[in-house]
Amino acid sequence: MKKLWIALLMAVCLVGCREDEVVVPTEYDVIPEEVKPGQKCIGMYLLNEGNMGSNKCTLDFVDFVQGYYVRNLYAERNPQVVKELGDVGNDIQIYGSRIYAVINCSNKIEVLDARTARRIGQIDVPNVRYVRFHKGYAYATSYVGPVQLNNPNAVQGAVYKIDTLSLKTVARCTVGYQPEELCVLGQYIYVANSGGYMAPNYDKTVSVIEIEGFKQVEKIPVAINLHHIKADAYGKLWVTSRGDYQGVHSKLLVLDKKMGRNEMQVTDTLDIPCSDFCISGDSLYYISTEWNNYSQSNAITYGIVNVRTKQKVSDHFITDGSEKEITVPYGIAIHPETHDIYVTDAKNYVSSGVLHCYNQYGIQKWSVRTGDIPAHLCFLMRK
């Protein structure tokens, strides 16, 4: 693939700004993309996690208008930031005109201009995991305590309420242990609690926070070691359980309202392992890399579930056989207009990964090298 290097002068200037660090300059790869007339989606950001402790979280950008994949964008746009993005990128979202990049082990949410990727500021949140938004506020899950595996005395997690104008925390609500993804639905925030630091005594609940009073009003028993939670168009919540990596397998669960009441409960359990998923229309696209401690290996699967019928309709969405090129499927997203499918490959977790693009029929369009552990994607829309 044709590669265009940014001007040598820029690289020299960047290195000059970091006396003790060598900064990898931004790279541009040509990709076969174009924006059709009337199309609102003009780009996609990809946050590369970077292996824990390596301080190698990076930001890439897919430019649908110009047909470029832009690698390591943050360092070029923000040469004054000494340690760049930081350690372990765990989530990325766009709200209004800003990017919110969650940098887990750097205990912060980095706030950038969505058009330029230039730094606006940061929000300090300890061991922060995911962020969502509602009426001018950001809500971020936090483990609260330090990174400490196998800690039976780990503290309960929390959701931080942040004013998106001042970038200041205005309130905090205690939830379950090691909370992961959260979802705003109606007047409530639903939080998937994992208890990941407390294995084998995992948490098994979804916390329910009333937005107006910002208090936890309920804990719904669901399954152990929860991770992702998303709502479909019918008001149901889809939740993933990672299991215990041994005898209890990963699965996908459905929460819906109790008959005649506002409370949610588990209505369906699908024995489908799921590491990550996204919902497009009535279709839930999932990927699974299920680790087993006994076999010391991953079981890799893909598929589609109809969210209306709650039935699996396919055990694959890549139809041309090119999934064999993927070593570790790690992240997934669906283009909101073209319905192209994006799957990231973490490879060996310590070197560059790959982003694969497939059309809506599952035929590969292109692949491109990314940063280390490509994981989280969000789309940039026209103003």
Q: What does each of the following model-derived ranges do?
A:
Residues 9-10:
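Hydrophobic alpha-helical targeting segments used for export or membrane insertion
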